[in-house]
Regions:
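Intrinsically disordered, low-complexity Ser/Thr/Pro/Gly-rich regulatory segments
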Residues: 1-216
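A sequence-level detector for short glycine-anchored, His/Arg-bearing signature motifs
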Residues: 316-326
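Short acidic-glycine loop/turn motifs at beta-strand connectors
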Residues: 106-108, 296-297, 306-308
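Short acidic/His/Gly/Ser-rich catalytic and metal-binding motifs that mark active-site loops
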Residues: 121-123, 301-304
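Charged, often glycine-rich, active-site loop that binds/positions anionic groups
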Residues: 88-97, 303-317
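N-terminal extension/subdomain marker
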Residues: 146-289, 298-301
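Short, well-ordered loop/turn elements at secondary-structure boundaries
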Residues: 98-99, 107, 287-289, 317
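Glycosyltransferase catalytic domains, chiefly GT-A lineage
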Residues: 114-116, 283, 294
Length: 326
């Protein structure tokens, strides 16, 4: 069982607090001197009290930034203040629990995130212990998410760790790969924040592409009537699909993760003004005026099932195109 997980729409007030780099506190007048020695700054004062602020600690700021990213990306359910709590024995309500810094659920994916930071760049001698502990929750977390928030299909469980100023060794990276835990650092986080600011919830599927390379997502399978043709040495398919599904299985371009120039590439390819004009055109005319070219990565993501047709086998062939995100 998962505790402290809510519908995202119920967390608007929390989202405002987490989106800020500072924390705020209202205090009585006699408390002000002590608070000032603890690093609080006086914002405004009245006859009976005052409002103070101070920068968030780095560990708090990292968790809040990661949580805010998932909120901006449109996850349906998110952990509340203090993270989520996973019961290690679902049959015992008062049994031991595992705290998870950030949890996000959407129709395809359930993600459990731990956040690790340091005040200055350094190695963490216990990082592999953290990896092992996080890896142990995978099955319980997946079962709890799918049982408490059921769907016609099971979500894919993703375990990730966001780090800030932690220096990871080759052994750390290898152990994370063995545990199938995604490692992302402060540069990756900044990249996704910029991408989310530019694309909004659509950036979620770029995150999925990076967290789940080659992973089959059961909620993202569909079949379409299609025509198969040849263009030089390449096999091509012509088909129609809903924009919502295309968005989930496609991303705009390959990139080297975490580089600012990749966001610049997105901004050139998908300008907000251009997107607005396209949206207005579709809204007014009900059609998209041109084809979209999609490149499939390998044979595992596409399967063409030929149908009977009259005439010879030369030229175009009619059939069913089976697509899946993987």
């Amino acid at each position: 069982m998962l505790e402290n997980v809510f519908v995202a729409d119920e967390l608007k007030s929390l989202a405002r607090r987490k989106s800020r780099d500072e924390e705020f506190h209202t205090a009585r007048k006699q408390e002000i001197p002590n608070l000032l020695t603890e690093g609080w700054n006086l914002q405004r004062e009245n006859k009976t009290g005052a409002r103070l602020s101070r920068p968030k600690r780095r560990d708090v700021l990292l968790e809040d930034r990661v949580w805010s990213l998932l909120y901006t990306l449109g996850f349906n359910h998110l952990s509340g203040e203090g993270g989520a709590f996973l019961h290690l024995d679902p049959k015992k309500n008062n049994g031991p629990k595992n705290q998870i810094d950030v949890v996000g659920l959407d129709p395809e994916v359930a993600i459990a995130i731990e956040c690790k930071s340091a005040s200055a760049p350094r190695r963490d001698p216990k990082f592999q212990e953290s990896l092992a502990k996080h890896g142990l929750i995978r099955e319980r977390f997946a079962n709890a998410a799918n049982a408490q928030f059921p769907l016609p299909h099971k979500r894919v469980a993703v375990l990730a760790i966001f780090t800030w100023d932690l220096l990871l060794s080759e052994n750390d990276l290898q152990r994370a790969e063995e545990q199938k835990i995604a490692l992302l650092n402060e540069n990756d986080l900044a990249y996704y924040e910029q991408l989310a600011a530019h694309l909004g919830p659509a950036a979620k599927y770029q995150l999925f592409a990076d967290l789940l390379p080659g992973k089959q997502i059961h909620g993202l399978r569909l079949a379409f009537p299609a025509i198969e043709t040849k263009m030089g040495k390449h096999t091509c398919f012509s088909f129609s699909m809903t924009p919502e599904y295309l968005l989930k299985i496609a991303y705009v371009s390959h990139r080297a993760k975490g580089k600012a120039r990749d966001v610049d590439t997105y901004q050139r390819m998908i300008k907000k003004g251009r997107l607005k004009r396209i949206r207005e055109y579709i809204r007014e005319n009900g059609i998209f005026p041109t084809n979209i070219v999609v490149s499939f990565e390998g044979r595992r993501s596409v399967r063409f099932e030929k149908r009977e047709q009259q005439g010879g086998a030369e030229g175009a062939r009619y059939g069913t195109l089976h697509l899946r995100a993987c």
